Amino acid sequence: AQMLSSIIPCILEQNDFEEVYSDTCWQKMKQGTGVWGVYWDQEKLGGLGDISIRPVNVLNLFWEPGVTDIQRSQNVFYLELEDNETLLAAYPQLAGKLGGSSAVLSRYRTDDAVDLSEKTLVVDWYYKKRVGGRTVLHYCKYVGQTVLYATENDTFVPSVTREEVDERGERTLVQVPVRGPACERGLYDDGEYPFIFDRLFPIEGSICGYGYIDIGKGAQEQIDRMDQAIVKNTIMAATPRWFRRSDGSVNEQEYADWTKPFVHVDGNLGQDSLQQAQVNMLPGICVQVLNNKIEELKWTTGNTDVTNGQVSSGVTAASAIAALQEASGRSSRASTQSAYRAYARLIRMVIERIRQFYDLPRRFRIVGAGGAEEFVSYCNARLKAQSMGPEALMRTPVFDVTVTAQKHTAYTKLAQNEPVSYTHLRAHET
């Protein structure tokens, strides 16, 4: 467990997990659902393969309607448009079978004009089967009617080359199978879909949730309408209009041009030649309703003044300010705890990928004792199922994943370390 705690951060860093985490959390805040994908990418590290963690576009993911847990869906489909040239280079059997995509995928509105004429829809189909009392996850990748890869058709037995000593004491290289073929074991040994959902505001009977845009767009639309009305009324009052008699003697062009100090008139200037059109100002209750709507939006989305560090003028006690901040951060704490739970599931899935695929020793640079760099070698030998005695019972190591937060800013680190340093100093003085 200690070794895993040291090498898993290396794996996350190789996947730029900070950016992946940020992108997924932005997706969660805006749309209500963030999805991570934990895969085994055989093309990584020059064909050796390694774990790949990527954000997943929830618009391209399809599951069984009515389920609240992705793992309970019988089938899961992930659709993606890929370039025809890339597909032909990887799968020559697709020659003459590719064309413009006829399927309509939900896409985000962008300023760029996206050309889909040279792209083809590729479907990744994940499905589960019960075999021998256990759940097996199978995978099929296809384009149109052509199957590109299917685990049920994969009979290849993975093996590694190891050096052994025979009966005569000579060293020989032998091929040792490390696991069964994919047609028997499936895609991943844990039997779970490689997708992790993180919801902001859960919806009953759905895997997805509401985002801040969903819960705040109603009040925001009303605020925008009232704000437009107030601005329009202000502009109308600032730029008055005039009624002019058809036989009026005032030069309109000169009267409308404020840069000209003189306005020419013909004959006597009567009071009824020009008359200003009166604009009724909006009553004060309109501004009050607008402010109330703004406060409603703040409380609905949890973006209150207390959350941003501002308190009412009458609140001065530190305990009262702390109580207000504690009460105002309930929604953010719930969202953070949800992200922690999703992150724990992601780490457990990473451990399962290590257990299944790290057959050969790999070198990692970790932080050793005293903060010094240390290079260690690790493989999955101690993670696999092990015999427990003559009864031929097998046990698989299981790990507890605990997520703890760390303050990122230097100021908070200094503020929290100051009491510790002071206590340490006082202990030496006494």
Regions found by a protein language model. Name each.
Residues 1-429:
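Extended alpha-helical, oligomerization-prone segments that build pores/tubes and scaffolds
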